[in-house]
Amino acid sequence: YSETRLPEVPSAILEMLSHQSFPDMRIAQDPLGKFYIARSIYKTILRFVNSNHGTRYVVQPLAPQNFSVTQNQGVALLSWTAQLDKTEPSARPTSYIIYKAEGQGGFDNGTIVNTTRCQMQLEPGKLYHFKVAAVNAGGESFTTETLSVLYNPAASKSVLIVNNFHRLASPQVVDDEEKQGFDFDQDPGVSYGLTAGWSGKQQVFDRSRMGN
């Protein structure tokens, strides 16, 4: 390809998966597979550019884990844990950004903290939303899920909401002697955030008609 033989900017052709290999397509449709591939490409580009300039690279951290919010007498306690990248020591977070939204408003520009715990004062009757991102010299991670809290001084009891749904999945896999593919009608899957990875549902599953 002339784009890589005669490039005006550094370029490369990445061939990681084959659209003719169903095991490869299962990886390509897996949200975690997409994330790992994208992050490995990002790391490679980062190392290439920094090595050309003779500078030390730092990989951006992964999103925090185990995020929780509790409140006591109008004070919200936010806590989380760091998610370490076992393949990249430089990706360790050095600080965190707490994003806050009040009522129907959008999120603010964030507050930087250096610990994995933080207290926030709450106004009675106002709904608050929080999310946290990890930060280091390499950049900012994806955020945690958004958690909400409301302080009602007149309440006699508290309500605890636990999100026990952390599933990520491709569309339903169909793979037997006669059929093969991804059935969106049976299960569209759960992507890692918004995705534009499809241009429509698979219509034909018959193995004998593949390639026609």
Where are these regions (language model features)?
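Aromatic-Pro/Gly-enriched surface loop or interdomain linker
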Residues: 145-212
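Predominantly extracellular/luminal cell-surface or secreted proteins
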Residues: 99-103, 162
